[in-house]
């Protein structure tokens, strides 16, 4: 399997807002992402409980954009298992209750592809979707998966969903032992639209921690599930297994937020169901589908 060389020399964050052309991330991009995941300066801690921490950061050049960073300690979950869970699109449909639809579109290289993901937003906001170029890199016992938004000619914005923009989103998985790891999730996303303050607050105080905990539960159940569902099929580890068609980078273009319709939802009030936690409230995760 081809691999990108991974250097460990420190690098500062690499700017991503001004991206003008579609490129598969290189070594410097992966180092920069790792550096930002590990950075502490400029981040405000908003949640820290039971091994899960959340930080937020306003983007100075555009105050409507916010970065969020979540970190979780995972006991009894090897780094390679968490890496598999994040890659396994069929398993995600089982454990991610927010997903509406998700599928891979095409392969770009042995460690990069293009995919579609749509998700449910807190009521009564409109649901969102995104097309992203995703790339991944094993770095010894650690792993990085990251993505950013692109435009694909066959998948234009849909009328029933708001097309969001991932400026840069990804995961850093760091092994801390044979059966333990730490995962850091870093996201800079333009959800397209003026969101009410309760959405931003709820994302950092409730939604992000809950999503991380649900991912952890899914990791614990993954080995048993995978044994019953094509146990040897892991194209993210064995690219020769990939059934995806190849796609040239020239077929894609960068998805800029300013080219999409802006939705003003700033005055939208939180629904009673969301305030009460809804059917999927804290502590009510339904794991019966993970079998």
UniProtKB/Swiss-Prot annotation:
User: Which residues get modified to Phosphoserine?
Assistant: 253, 259, 284, 289
Cellular location(s): Cell projection, Cilium, Flagellum; Cytoplasm; Membrane
Q: Provide the positions where the record notes the PTM N6-succinyllysine.
A: 94, 197, 202
Reading the lineage from the top rank, the first entry is Eukaryota
State one Pfam family annotation: START
The molecular function terms in GO held by this entry are: lipid binding
List, alphabetically, the PANTHER family matched.
PHOSPHATIDYLCHOLINE TRANSFER PROTEIN, START DOMAIN-CONTAINING PROTEIN 10
Name the UniProt record assigns to this protein: START domain-containing protein 10
Q: Which gene encodes it?
A: STARD10
């Amino acid at each position: 399997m081809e691999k990108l060389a991974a250097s460990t020399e420190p690098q500062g964050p690499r700017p991503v807002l001004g991206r003008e052309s579609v490129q598969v991330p290189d070594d410097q991009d992966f180092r920069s992402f790792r550096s930002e995941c590990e950075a502490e300066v400029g981040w405000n801690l908003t949640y820290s409980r039971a091994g899960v921490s959340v930080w937020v950061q306003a983007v100075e050049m555009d105050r409507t954009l916010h970065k969020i960073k979540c970190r979780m300690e995972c006991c009894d979950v090897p780094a390679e298992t968490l890496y598999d869970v994040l890659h396994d699109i069929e398993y995600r449909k089982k454990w991610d209750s927010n997903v509406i639809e998700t599928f891979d579109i095409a392969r770009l290289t042995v460690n990069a592809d293009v995919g579609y993901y749509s998700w449910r937003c807190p009521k009564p906001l409109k649901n969102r979707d995104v097309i992203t170029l995703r790339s991944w890199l094993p770095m010894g016992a650690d792993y990085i998966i990251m993505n950013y938004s692109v435009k694909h000619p066959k998948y234009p914005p849909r009328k029933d969903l708001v097309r969001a923009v991932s400026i840069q989103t990804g995961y850093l998985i760091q092994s801390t032992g044979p059966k333990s790891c730490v995962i850091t999730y870093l996201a800079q996303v333009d959800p397209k639209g003026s969101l009410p303050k309760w959405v931003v607050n709820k994302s950092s105080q409730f939604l992000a921690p809950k999503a991380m905990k649900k991912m952890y539960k899914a990791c614990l159940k993954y080995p048993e599930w995978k044994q019953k569902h094509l146990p040897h099929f892991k194209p993210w580890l064995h690219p020769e297994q990939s059934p995806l068609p190849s796609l040239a980078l020239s077929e894609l273009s960068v998805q800029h937020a300013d080219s999409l319709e802006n939705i003003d939802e700033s005055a939208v009030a939180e629904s009673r169901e969301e305030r009460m936690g809804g059917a999927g409230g804290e502590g009510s995760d339904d794991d019966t589908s993970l079998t």
